[in-house]
Amino acid sequence: MAGSELIVFKEMREKGVDVVVTGTSTAAHAVVEAGGNIPVVTFGINDPLRTGLVASFAHPGGQVTGMSNFAGDLVPKRIELFKAAVPAISKIALARCPECGRQSGLSKSSIDAAFENYSENARSLGLTLIPLDIDAATDFPAAAALVKREQADGVLLMPTQINAKLRDDWVAFETAQRVPVMGDYRGYGCLLSFGPDPAERAPSG
């Protein structure tokens, strides 16, 4: 967990903050790790059970409650839609952030198992999936070079904070290299998108 996040949430605890509302698993974990019992309300995070934020859906326990978008579960459907929209596609680079997964409480084995699950789905459609690890914005040039070197004919963006920050870079890459990119949110401006609208799932009022 990033030290800066822990410091922020420890300061919140000391100032008597009543509740924390967040849209990321990383922040939710930071609140829990900072100690205390500040309630955490989440919206649009990935599977809270798999990342260890709750004990079960029926009886979550602890201090975390809210909504999940199960974004990882949508990846197989995204692969299927990508193939339907671009029939000639044969090799997809999956832009993921293993470090984001670790900060959200996932073990390396869980991250690897998730990729293998996606790969299996891709193989059933006659596709090859290439892991494209982007843990920081500075990793983008190397990732873009890998897409070209591996001759991937499509890029699938996992719903990570890093890919959200790099959305303009991905659109520019897509235009310059003529390689279709699929995101999880249409606001990114990629050729394709499939996923929940963050504006619709965010709290209002």
Sequence positions of predicted segments:
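Short hydrophobic alpha-helices and adjacent helix-cap/hinge residues
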Residues: 1-205
